[in-house]
Structures are given as structure tokens and as C-alpha cells.
Amino acid sequence: MKIIGIGNALVDILYCLDDEHLLSEIHLKKDAMTLINERWEHEIEKMTSDVDKFMANGGSISNTMVALARLGREVGFIGRIGDDEMGRFFDAKLRDAGVHTQLIKGLEATGVAHTFVTPGGNRTFGTLLGAAYYLGPHDITEEMFRGYDLLHIEGYLVQNQELIESICQRAKQAGLILSLDLSSFNVVSKNRTYFHHLISDYIDIVFANEGEARAFTGSFDPQEQLRHIAHLCDIAVVKLGDQGSIAMLEGGRIYKCNAEYVENVVDTTAAGDYFAAGFLHALTRGHRLEKCLQIGTILATEAVQVLGSQLSPAAWNRIKSSIHCR
């Protein structure tokens, strides 16, 4: 099966912080994604001028597609970039990983996610969407999905409901399975009713972390969260951090996978994205949910041990060896 993803095309600028004080000074909500404007970005740049930083490809769904490509899968990515250095950087990184890109170029600058990593590997985003903000229904054609079997969608896109509705309709018309990552608890909180419509009408597979699942369902019980989501779609997955992950088919039993112990968690930025890649890789190879969770966990375990989303060749060799042994 061939997999394509659609989401915000962003370049990450990563900052490693010794504590959380700077986050309050630049008015970013800890452990959440906040949309910023150009003036706000200018303030962030001014206040972080003496903080170590580096640039890497970002965007939740593009991370997942890169991970799938590294596992040898045929994958694609749809997004919108600017005709600028950041856009060329983004495109080149995806292509180098083996991802087929369908990138619409706009007049706006390529989007940037200022990503702050605090002790314990937690991350906070100040995101200037730039060109990604202008991805619209007119950019999406059914032809983009031809030849693919599954579409993985970024939950952040619900902030443009006309766009995500168009994406889902055209992908369904093309016969694709639809997978959705809820992406952010504050986005879910603001769009709870619309997410309910989207999932019940279009989505086959849902990924959520515990915070997102709580925002969507109103429940603090992970198993109740899982049942609620699974009632609306075919497969529900709730990620529980160091408590592992759970999944179920609609009306079926609950499967659980424990997290692997990691002595030094560096950065959780791409952990959920890599988990989704491992899960979808196994699922589209016909494996049971229990094994899908295990393979997702293998990838997430490696992801939290590096800063950013790029794993070394040695890490990919460990991943492939672990998958082969399961």
C-alpha cells in the first residue's frame, strides 16, 4: 500500500532551554502549539538571539512520511511552501529521504515552527504558518491522490474547515483510507464539535495523545477515551507517553503496549509522528493491532533520544532490526 500525507509544510527552528522562564517571557503556552504573527516572531527572534538553535525539517505529517520512506515505503507529501530558501530546504530534505513531494509554491514565505525544548524533552511551538496558511481547497485535486491507498492528515488543518472538508471528500472519492492525527490539545479544544463531524463522516483511523483525547472526549480515563473515539471510526489509538499506548477496533477488545524505558529523553518533538509511521507501516502490511503498537513504540523510542526529527543511519538500522525480530 502507498501512503500520502497532507499537512503544514514547516521548517523547525529548534532551541534547547535550561528552564521554562523564556516561554512565559515570549508568551507561549508550555507544551502546546501557538500560532504567531510576524511581529510576534520578530520578538521571539530578538529574545532568543543568544540561545543556541538549529534548523531542521518540520511539520507533523512530513515527519511521518519521512519515517515511512526510511522504512522503505512508497510515500508522498502535499503542502504549500514559499519560493524561497526555506522552501527549497524543506523540499530537498523530503526528496533526499525518498518522499515524493507535491508542493504548491506561493508568494508568501515558507512557514516556520519555533520549537522550544525544555528539560525532560517537552516541546512548545510558536508557529508562523506563512505559505502553509494559504493552502486552500483550490490547491487540492483528486488527481493528487491517485495511486495511493491511504491518506494521513494533520489535525492542525481543521483551522481551515473548508480545506480539510475538501481534502476528505476528494480522498474518499479517490478510494483512500483516511487517517487523522489530532495534533494538539488546544486545537482540539477549540474545534471539538467539528472534529466529531470530521471523524464520524470521513475518518477511518484516529491517533491522539492523552491530552488530545481528553480534550475531544471530556474523559480523564484513557480506556474510556479510546472507546469514545473508536465508536466514531474503525481504529482508534491513544498514546500515553511513558505509560505506553492503547488501540482498539470499533466494538473490539483493547490492545496495550508498554513504553520502552529511555534513560535520557532529549526531545519529544517527533515522537508521536514516528509512532504513527511505525503503526501505519505495520497496519498496511496486515499486522494485528498489538504488533502495530509495538512497531510504533520502537520508532518513538528512537525519536525521543535525539534533538529534532532526524535519526542517524545507526538508529534506522536498530529500528529495522527490531522490527524484523518482532
Predicted feature locations:
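Glycine-rich phosphate/adenosyl-contacting loop at the front of the ribokinase-like
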Residues: 1-78
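Conserved phosphate-binding/catalytic region of the ribokinase-like
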Residues: 3-16, 26-34, 49-50, 193, ...
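Anion (oxyanion) recognition and catalysis
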Residues: 69, 95, 172-173, 230
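Conserved beta-alpha-beta core of the PfkB/ribokinase-like small-molecule kinase fold
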Residues: 150-227, 243-245
